[in-house]
């Protein structure tokens, strides 16, 4: 893969001026700051590609947040032969292997500043920890491969035994602590992982680890709170004003996003985001690559937001501002989808002339020539997150045109609001229900969600 990266950096003009240099390898590729950075870039996307579908099915379908027809993830009947589960496992191990290989190669980088070398090595370790964090939560006991080269040298890579979950968590913690030693504290302007991003992940790992034994470990809770507090107070980051704006491509480098998959649109398959294909209804974009209309948010999730599919759209009151940014429902109109489409007169609100009207998409052929006359949303709603809209929307947000099953919308994995709630939860579990910072964190997150309902600040978290 490194060879492919190196070849991809050669310009067309180079072929006119000199013979093709196609013998890049780990000994000569990492030469200079730019090559080290480019050599790490793909860890933010390609190895994760086959994890995307499992990411939704394990995380959202099995949790009850999403309805997905007859999927075995709906009734917990998955087994070791399930294609998406197998691909999910392969993807996570691939990420771990790539991170380890690049990390070891960077040790021998030449003509490279110590700052950039350390930064890149820290990014490798942070992503390796993230992959193991998904592995242990999904599969439980798993092997630990600390060094690819050592395992290959010993020839024991097919016989490595599984390690108990508690020990996997210790390894993740050790990996993140080393990453934090290497990463800069300065916030990146291009979405790269920094010290506080890794520390935020560490706080989440400790909070999760606290319950692994079956009873809450107070020391782990203290660590979760300690690391979360440092991120909150010293990272210099803040929440986006409006929840829905976090997930727009134009805000991909906002303060709130700590760690995200950073996809690209290009010729290399697996570097792209394809979540819209699985989650959006047919005809949502013009690339013929959407088939997710018959799956969608569950009634349970709708009720958690305080709404019901039985509500009359004309009279529905949304108590939670996050609902519309998560679930499309009858009566909803979006300014950031289909912004090159004229809205029907009945859907024009607050001066909005162009955009996406959920009901008109299904029933109005004058608005959508492919309207089927039937709403596919199985529970009365459709997905919003992980969608970019049509080609015009993608270009407006990200500056490039998407391709078939290929878009560049980042996928946030860890946000500052998560860290706020991690701190609050850790304090509550330790019995500190009136901790000032915990209350402030909780109220900031909930206040944004209920901003238009006159949110009343909590004075206790119980």
Enumerate the predicted regions with their spans.
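Conserved, well-structured interaction surfaces
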Residues: 25, 30-49, 68-139, 159-170, ...
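C-terminal motif of bacterial Sec signal peptides marking the signal peptidase cleavage site
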Residues: 9-11
């Amino acid at each position: 893969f490194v060879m492919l990266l190196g070849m991809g950096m050669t310009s067309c003009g180079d072929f006119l001026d000199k013979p093709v240099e196609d013998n890049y390898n780990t000994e000569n590729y990492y030469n200079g700051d730019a090559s080290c950075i480019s050599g790490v870039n793909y860890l933010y996307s390609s190895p994760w590609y086959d994890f995307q579908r499992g990411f939704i099915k394990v995380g959202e379908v099995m949790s009850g947040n999403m309805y997905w027809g007859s999927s075995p993830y709906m009734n917990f009947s998955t087994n070791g032969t399930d294609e998406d589960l197998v691909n999910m496992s392969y993807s996570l191990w691939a990420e771990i292997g790539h991170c380890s290989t690049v990390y070891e190669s960077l040790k021998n980088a030449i003509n490279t500043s110590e700052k950039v070398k350390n930064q890149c090595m820290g990014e490798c370790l942070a992503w390796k920890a993230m992959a193991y964090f998904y592995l242990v939560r999904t599969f439980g006991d798993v092997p630990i491969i600390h060094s690819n080269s050592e395992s290959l040298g010993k020839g024991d890579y097919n016989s490595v035994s599984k390690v108990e979950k508690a020990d996997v968590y210790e390894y993740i913690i050790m990996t993140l602590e080393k990453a934090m030693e290497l990463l800069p504290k300065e916030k990146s302007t291009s979405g790269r992982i920094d010290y506080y991003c890794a520390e935020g992940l560490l706080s989440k790992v400790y909070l999760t680890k606290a319950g692994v034994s079956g009873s809450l470990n107070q020391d782990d809770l203290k660590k979760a709170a300690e690391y979360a507090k440092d991120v909150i107070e010293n990272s210099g980051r803040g929440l986006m004003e409006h929840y829905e704006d976090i997930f727009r491509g134009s805000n991909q480098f906002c303060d709130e996003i700590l760690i995200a998959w950073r996809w690209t649109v290009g010729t290399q398959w697996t570097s792209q985001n394809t979540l819209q294909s699985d989650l959006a209804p047919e005809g949502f974009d013009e690339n013929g690559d959407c088939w997710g209309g018959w799956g969608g948010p569950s009634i349970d999730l709708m009720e958690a937001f305080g709404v019901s599919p039985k509500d009359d759209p004309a009279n529905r009151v949304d108590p939670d501002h996050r609902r519309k940014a998560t679930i499309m429902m009858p009566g909803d109109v979006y300014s950031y989808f289909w912004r090159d489409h004229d809205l029907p007169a009945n859907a024009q609100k607050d001066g909005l002339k162009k955009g996406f009207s959920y009901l008109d998409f299904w029933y109005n052929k004058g608005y959508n020539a492919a309207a089927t006359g039937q709403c596919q949303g199985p529970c009365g709603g459709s997905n919003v997150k992980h969608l970019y809209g049509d080609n015009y929307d993608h270009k407006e947000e990200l500056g490039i045109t998407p391709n078939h099953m290929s878009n560049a919308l980042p996928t946030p994995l860890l946000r500052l609001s998560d860290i706020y709630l991690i701190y609050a939860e850790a304090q509550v579990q330790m019995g500190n229900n009136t901790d000032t910072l915990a209350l402030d964190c909780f109220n900031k997150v909930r206040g944004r969600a209920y901003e238009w309902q006159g949110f009343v600040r909590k004075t206790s978290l119980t």
